[in-house]
Design a protein with these regions (language model features):
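C-terminal motif of bacterial Sec signal peptides marking the signal peptidase cleavage site
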Residues: 12-13
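Residue-level hotspots at or immediately adjacent to binding/recognition sites across diverse folds
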Residues: 16-354
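Sec-dependent N-terminal signal peptides
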Residues: 7-9
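Positively charged n-region of N-terminal signal peptides that target proteins for export
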Residues: 1-3
Length: 354
């Protein structure tokens, strides 16, 4: 969603709902600020391992570390600086292979791919609809991915690739629920869409009367929508979705235009996103911009926003604050190491230890 992000700052697997995970009280999270080499606003992070991490953001900024954050390399995308592209999402598979999504109106929404560590890039997709604005994307594997745009003329805009990004055809309108007036996503962190296994994906929406989660269980061929009990309208809705398995997920957001606001902006599901219930609001005020499940730690997730960084050990039912600095996105490369990024080139390493 281009309008409200401040620059300064299908069948689902069925079964009985599991009890909330038992928190590991001995484990703790610590933050390690990194030495930065940019002052750009960083809005996305992808860590395919504990040692390899890619981050991206405004002013065509892309950085990569191959040594767990000890050093960072700038990565040049030819022509991106001329258009001052905002790389608001990144997905990396290793130190060599990564995809970038630039967000913006019309042709400023693009998808790029590198297979040689950023030495060269292929522009795979350029948006040709002046009213579309691509917010986020995610991949099931190196060949199959999904990208989401704000709705256009009353229809949802979901694209699927099955050939490594060479083509991105639109999902037919008949396979998608109708869009609400104004419905889209908040392109804050690259976490408004999440994929799981080889078939499941979820997309969080906002800026319409009601916040919703779109879900697919067949690799993006068909989609359904569920209302989420998070305030909607204008600058409100969902900015992030996070799932630890095909049943248990968390949807987070709020009012992205009011950093002092407090509202019911966290919801949980135990049936794959068919139904949602309100959960405990995170500790920091304002909206959650990004969230991620910590892999290998059931029920653990980290949520970030312009007013702080929280973590939960019980799927969002309770929260612990770790920082009050501004962050826009968060990602984990293992059960022990993650990364949060934000304004003025901020990169912070998150370490889970006993």
């Amino acid at each position: 969603m281009k309008r409200w992000l401040p620059l300064a700052m299908g069948m689902v697997a069925c079964g009985p709902a599991a009890a909330p995970p038992v928190p590991d009280s001995a484990a703790r999270l610590t933050l390690e600020p990194q030495t930065t080499i940019t002052t750009a606003l960083l809005q996305a992070v992808s860590a395919p391992s504990a040692r390899v991490v890619w981050v991206s953001g405004h002013a065509a900024t892309v950085l990569r570390s191959r040594d767990g954050g000890q050093t960072w390399e700038p990565v040049n995308v030819p022509g991106a600086a001329v258009d001052s592209l905002q790389f608001r999402d990144v997905q990396a598979f290793d130190a060599r292979t990564a995809y970038l999504l630039s967000a913006g109106p019309g042709p400023l929404s693009r998808i790029y791919k590198t297979a040689d560590g950023g030495r060269s890039w292929e522009r795979q997709f350029t948006n040709t609809d002046s009213t579309a604005f691509y917010d986020c994307f995610a991949f099931w594997d190196m060949r199959r991915g999904v990208a989401f745009s704000d709705a256009v003329r009353g229809r949802m805009m979901v694209r699927i690739t099955e050939d490594g990004g060479s083509t991105w055809p639109l999902v037919p309108a008949a396979a998608l629920p109708p869009a609400q007036p104004g419905e889209g996503a908040f392109a804050a962190s690259g976490t408004c869409v999440v994929t799981l296994d080889q078939r499941h994906a979820w997309i969080g929406t906002g800026a319409a009367d009601t916040a919703r989660v779109l879900r697919t269980a067949d690799g993006g061929r068909t989609w359904s929508a569920s209302v989420v009990p998070v305030p909607g309208g204008g600058t409100k809705g969902l900015a992030a979705v996070a799932f630890r398995d095909t049943l248990h997920g968390t949807a987070l957001g709020g009012d992205v235009a009011d950093p002092k606001s407090r509202m019911d902006n966290v919801a949980i599901t135990e049936d794959g996103g068919r139904t949602w219930q309100r959960a405990t609001t995170q500790t920091f005020s304002g909206a959650v911009y990004g969230a991620v499940v910590i892999p290998g730690r059931p029920g653990w997730l980290v949520a970030v926003g312009p007013r702080g960084l929280d973590y939960s050990k019980d799927d969002g039912r309770s929260w612990t604050n770790l920082d009050t600095l501004a962050y826009w996105s968060v990602g984990f490369g293992s059960k022990d190491v993650g990364w949060a990024v934000g304004p003025r080139g901020r990169i912070t390493r998150i370490v889970v230890s006993r």
